[in-house]
């Protein structure tokens, strides 16, 4: 390996050009930066003497992909001013595409409290790895499904595939399993158009979980945002395995949306390890108080500071990597309010401006989780176009309407119409409302109708973790086991919830497994359960519920009013009509105080009937000859073509002949 040359300041990270590797690292407060090269246990330290602005850089001739490296960054250790430099700590490149190994908690990883910790961390710190980004995409084309035709499917790579009997055991639980024909066929037959993957960025397990023998299964503890998580790979080449999977999904017409975490890092609070950003430029990367402590708006010990130009550049470059190098179609941003903090939230924050102006990111699907845990954190409806947003009002109101009956028909209608009172502003369209009943965070749909209370004891926190505001209803018996009458009522509730989800205006999101009744045994916070509790139970699938769900998605595609990218107009019968059980327009009283009965006529030809009452009720239908539309049973209670006898808490869809 030749002498270290000056190299160039851009792009950040390590980049192989066919003849050598360029290294570039941002640090505004460092006094010295050393590039550390590893050959087995042998470490060679090469000072980066070239500096352009705040970028330290060098070029290593003859270096090849697979080279293991890290950094030691020296400077002041003054926590009161936010400076925590410690050259005793080997640091990961924040732009690294791969890490060799896994972070196992060790006291030597700690950088120090009031004084720098003197122990060297190299022996216990996995290094970064140089990666060749070249890849033959074989003509891959992004599906670019219009938002108005999108059906999201939220899934965990391991959870979705680990127990699937049709996938070879050697690849179950990995990216390769997602690309297996059995899984591709399943997703296409179900009818979803986009796979929203829970985090696949390289993460680390919190020391607390490691001490209990648990893992951060969900992965919302990002360590290296540019790196494909190696724990989800079947091969020793995670990047290319992931790209193979993206290409296979695209060939099946399925988009790939990544759940990304840019609100905090795996370094946690002051008690956490010094692995990368803290030791490189703590004061630039993190939001700090006046005395140098970490803000905790994400509830994870630290908060990334996207208001800083260098941090913003880092995040935008990371998203560009995933989109342009890995061909992902979009992103869901975890605790996205933090991304717009200045420190108060602003819809015109630099991050949003950078996305809108970017050459390619502006065309991606962008989804915000529109809250964080700090004051002013709840920002539903406040994100700028072209963002869509997870709509927790849809989730909670639909649960309350169907399972508790404590909301009027008017609330159901507002949620059914893409929560227009929240999202219809500026240039935003109905698809901006991502409608959901469940997500990874909370009960599954099956558990929602089987448990009144969470059962999270396996998480090791005495059942204190996880929300208590579930709006669930066990139908009289706590737990999965119940008599047939109770089970029948639960099935009716699941069907009603799924119908209003998949036939509402907006963008529906289905949690993987809800389509066939998957359960997590009442655990509503399975973030640390990398085991059979959280993996999908394919062997227990309810085939009838699966057929019903896929039929609803097909029905959704056939209704023009649900495929349009514009808001419904009440005066346009080709959009929607809201009728009472007598087939007449609802009165103001009925909207807010009337019985829980409604007829929703869509595009003139389709009629969604809602009887959310505890008794059988007859509905007088609008003029026309009606029949029951699949996936609803042809034997459903259509009496004479003009009357529907609705069972308690039931829904049905009719189509005009």
Swiss-Prot record:
Q: What chemistry does it catalyse, as a reaction equation?
A: Hydrolysis of (1->6)-alpha-D-glucosidic linkages to branches with degrees of polymerization of three or four glucose residues in limit dextrin
How does its activity get regulated?
Slightly activated by Ca(2+). Inhibited by divalent cations such as Zn(2+), Cu(2+), Fe(2+), Mg(2+), Mn(2+), but only slightly inhibited by EDTA.
**How is temperature linked to this protein's activity?**
Optimum temperature is 40 degrees Celsius.
Where in or outside the cell?
Answer: Cytoplasm
* Transition state stabilizer (site feature) positions: 441
Would you tell me the Gene Ontology cellular component terms? cytoplasm
Q: Sorted alphabetically, which keywords does the UniProt record give?
A: Carbohydrate metabolism, Cytoplasm, Glycogen metabolism, Glycosidase, Hydrolase
Q: Which SMART domains match?
A: Aamy
Name the Enzyme Commission number(s) assigned to this protein: 3.2.1.196
Field pH dependence: Optimum pH is 7.
Q: Give the UniProt record's GO annotations in the biological process aspect.
A: glycogen catabolic process
Where is the segment annotated Disordered?
A: 458-485
Q: Which residues form the active site?
A: 334, 369
Q: In which pathway does it act?
A: Glycan degradation; glycogen degradation
User: Can you name one GO molecular function term for this protein?
Assistant: glycogen debranching enzyme activity
Stretches with biased composition (Polar residues): 465-475
Broad class of enzyme this protein falls into: hydrolase
UniProt xrefs under InterPro entries = GlgX_C (IPR040784), GlgX_Isoamylase_N_E_set (IPR044505), Glyco_hydro_13_cat_dom (IPR006047), Glyco_hydro_13_N (IPR004193), Glyco_hydro_b (IPR013780), Glycogen_debranch_bac (IPR022844), Glycogen_debranch_GlgX (IPR011837), Glycoside_hydrolase_SF (IPR017853)
Gene3D superfamilies (UniProt xref): Glycosidases, Golgi alpha-mannosidase II, Immunoglobulins
Query: Which purpose does this protein serve, as stated in its record?
Result: Removes maltotriose and maltotetraose chains that are attached by 1,6-alpha-linkage to the limit dextrin main chain, generating a debranched limit dextrin. Hydrolyzes the alpha-1,6-glycosidic linkages in amylopectin while does not hydrolyze the alpha-1,4-glycosidic linkages in amylose. Native glycogen is a poor substrate.
Q: Write out the similarity annotation.
A: Belongs to the glycosyl hydrolase 13 family.
**PANTHER family in the cross-refs:** GLYCOGEN DEBRANCHING ENZYME (PTHR43002)
**What protein name is recorded for this chain?**
Glycogen debranching enzyme
